[in-house]
Design a protein with these regions (language model features):
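C-terminal lobe/lid and adjacent interdomain/linker elements of RecA-like ASCE P-loop ATPase modules
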Residues: 2-16, 292-380
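Phosphate-coordinating catalytic segments in nucleotide- and nucleic-acid-processing enzymes
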Residues: 2-31, 81-271, 356-367, 376-380
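Pre-Walker A-like glycine/lysine-rich segment at the N-terminus of P-loop NTPase domains
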Residues: 2-78
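Conserved D-loop-proximal element of ABC-family nucleotide-binding domains
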Residues: 286-287, 291
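ABC ATPase nucleotide-binding domain "signature" loop
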Residues: 283-285, 316
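Conserved glycine(s) of the Walker
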Residues: 69, 254, 285
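Walker B catalytic acidic pair
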Residues: 279-281
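Walker B motif beta-strand of ABC-family P-loop ATPases
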Residues: 275-277
Length: 380
């Protein structure tokens, strides 16, 4: 059992996200509120601290067939956070799928104070000259009172005037600082630098890596080198420095992923990031271990924190967590456009006895891939 870390955590909750002409998302919306209190839930405190009626989904398992946008959604969020922190418009323009059309992102989130923030960034075409376009920022906010619901706060949102000169250094003067950690392949700066006690991270690293590869029991802090650890297997030494493996070719794919998993779990235990996104990091790891480590993550999630966890593992459908914790992405081609949509298990399965696994197996959530093209490979 990991020792409890006594530390006041950071608030970071996403309530709503809208994307239009962003990567493969057109007119897309995903919402993280839920209407009804769940009795005896295994995920406690799914509401804003001291605001019991302001409910949010604290842990979300995001599923769907290949190429439905699970990883891309994480990339979009990472770049949106980049916009908030730096004001750099390139984070926005790099996401636009078709630059000849308008594009838009809109995110609602809570961080720090009990204030609902809404940031909208859009690419708008000049009405007199379609070749000209401009990026428009809009920021709205509203205070959250102890008796407020999410829906009630939406009615109070007010536009705040933005100083264009300040936009060049980011929107945090308006929104406050944001806190997050991503485990996302092929992305730089997934894990923000955080101050987790090296002894805590070492303990988590030993537990995770030692479970994935029992031959890796000798793990220690590398003396004299900041933020560095050495993993030993006999005469071999694998160095982990600044969250990156120097010679990862000596480890299995699952063990390499385990380092990112350990970083994420340590961050959650220390309550230092607030928002966490774990994207398909258990593809090379046994299903029972995925379930166990996900359980550890939600066990240590504190009030006003949030985890989005993407996976293809259908065994995750058997977890004893609320139905509203499951969301399914699907993607269809409508004319010349790719349409990505989300379906929440709780919107379809209303009875306590309804099985999410059975519903998924019967493609209720449109999450089963179309295998018809493979039929030609089986023809005589």
């Amino acid at each position: 059992m990991i020792d409890e870390v006594i530390k006041e955590g950071y608030t970071m909750i996403i309530m709503n996200l809208e994307l239009d002409n962003i990567y493969g998302f057109n007119d897309f919306r995903i919402n993280f509120s839920y209407p009804k209190k769940i009795v005896n839930s295994n995920i406690p405190n799914e509401h804003l601290k001291d605001c019991p009626k302001f409910r949010y989904k604290k842990a979300v398992i995001l599923m769907g067939a290949n190429a439905t946008g699970k990883t891309t959604l994480g990339r979009a969020l990472l770049r949106i956070f980049g916009i908030i922190e730096t004001g750099n418009p390139n984070y926005f323009t790099q996401m636009i799928r078709d630059k000849n059309k308008t594009a838009r992102i809109c995110i609602e989130f809570i961080n720090g104070e009990k204030i609902l923030n809404r940031l909208t960034v859009s690419l708008e075409k000049d009405k007199s000259n379609s070749l000209l376009a401009s990026i428009v920022y809009k920021y709205e906010s509203a205070p959250i009172r102890p008796t407020d619901t999410y829906e009630k706060v939406l009615l109070k949102m007010k536009t705040q005037k933005l100083d264009e000169k300040m936009l060049s250094v980011g929107l945090t003067p308006y929104t406050g600082q944001i806190f997050y950690s991503f485990a996302l392949d092929n992305e730089e700066n997934n894990h923000q630098t955080y101050s987790t006690d090296p002894k805590l991270f070492l303990k988590v690293l030993k537990a995770v890596i030692g479970t994935l590869d029992p031959s890796l029991k000798d793990i220690s802090i590398l003396d004299g080198v900041e933020n560095s650890y050495v993993i030993r297997r006999g005469s071999q030494e694998i160095i982990l420095q600044n969250n990156k493996l120097v010679n990862q070719n000596l480890l299995s794919s699952g063990t390499v992923r385990g380092v990112d998993i350990a970083l994420l779990i340590a961050s959650i235990i220390a309550n230092e990031r607030g928002f966490y996104y774990c994207d398909e990091h258990f593809s090379y790891i046994q299903t029972d271990l995925e379930k166990r480590m996900f359980g550890i993550m939600i066990e240590h999630l504190q009030e006003d924190e949030q985890l989005i966890f993407t996976t293809h593992n259908t065994d995750m459908l058997d977890l004893n967590i609320p139905k509203h914790s499951y969301a399914f992405l699907s993607r269809n081609i409508e004319g010349d456009e790719i349409k990505t949509s989300v379906m929440y298990a709780s919107d379809v399965l209303k009875r306590n006895t309804d099985s999410i696994r059975c519903a998924a197996a019967n493609d209720v959530f449109s999450s089963i891939p179309d295998e018809s093209l493979l039929d030609s490979l089986s023809e005589d």
